[in-house]
């Protein structure tokens, strides 16, 4: 079991680095899928088969595939993106170092007064499945954080739609109210065109 743990952990670290360092976005998504698969392997080692299945079905089957479709459909200029990244490389490195230092300080301060013990055991009932145990905890003790997380995701979805929704003036569209208000008097126009000159000064709506 420790061999598989270190194997999955090493593969997760390597694939995560490949996600960040890959120049091609399609390769980054493929490495991300590989990361999720190894993460599900860790869940199986911990005995959480339901979480492993959710990680495969939701993250790999929905989110990662959605990323892949979006990247394949978008016409991304990778050379231009790399040029912009090089222009802001110093700022990116500075922000990364600050976040890394913050993470290290947080880990050191949070684990300073922890007493480690290897004689820790958890009572697991044989008549309760993995899914039922997660549901009992999720909808009782963590009901409020679960609802708040759903609300945050809903707000993020609405924000993405608002930011990407643009009004296009060049596209022709129908005005149902104006179409229903038309009648014979404002639709039919009787004219007397001059011979060989055609009809002029007619406004179409």
From Swiss-Prot:
Highest rank taxon of the organism: Bacteria
Q: Which UniProt keywords apply?
A: Cell membrane, Membrane, NAD, Quinone, Translocase, Transmembrane, Transmembrane helix
Stored Pfam families: Oxidored_q3
Which residue stretches, if any, does this entry annotate as coiled coil?
Answer: none
Catalytic activity, per the record?
Answer: a quinone + NADH + 5 H(+)(in) = a quinol + NAD(+) + 4 H(+)(out)
The primary location reported for this protein is: membrane
Q: In the Enzyme Commission scheme, what number(s) does this protein have? A: 7.1.1.-
Q: How does it sit in the membrane?
A: Multi-pass membrane protein
Where is it localised? Cell membrane
Transmembrane stretches in the record are: 1-21, 26-46, 54-74, 89-109, 142-162
Establish whether keyword Membrane is in the entry: yes
Q: GO CC terms for this protein? A: plasma membrane
Return the protein name.
NADH-quinone oxidoreductase subunit J
Keyword Nucleotide-binding in annotation: no
Q: Which family does it belong to?
A: Belongs to the complex I subunit 6 family.
Q: What does this protein do?
A: NDH-1 shuttles electrons from NADH, via FMN and iron-sulfur (Fe-S) centers, to quinones in the respiratory chain. Couples the redox reaction to proton translocation (for every two electrons transferred, four hydrogen ions are translocated across the cytoplasmic membrane), and thus conserves the redox energy in a proton gradient.
Per the record, the gene is nuoJ
GO MF annotations, alphabetized: NADH dehydrogenase (ubiquinone) activity; quinone binding
Database matches in PANTHER family? NADH-UBIQUINONE OXIDOREDUCTASE CHAIN 6
